C-alpha cells in the first residue's frame, strides 16, 4: 500500500518537473521576444495577477501558492 502511494508520488514529481521545464522554455522564448522588442523582461503586475488568480482557483494555502509562484518566476528568469 505504502509502496503504491510512493510510486504515484514519484510519477507526479516527474510530471511536475516536466511541466516546469516546459514552462521555463516558454519563459525563455518570451524573454527573447521582450529583448528584441526592447521591453522590460519583468512584468510585476502580470506576476501579481497570476498569483491572485491561482490563489482563487487553488485549494492550497494562499501563502504557499504565492511563495511557490515567486520561486517559479525567479527560477524561470534564470533558466
PLM region spans:
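Domain-level signature for soluble enzymes in the chorismate/prephenate branch of the shikimate pathway
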Residues: 1-79
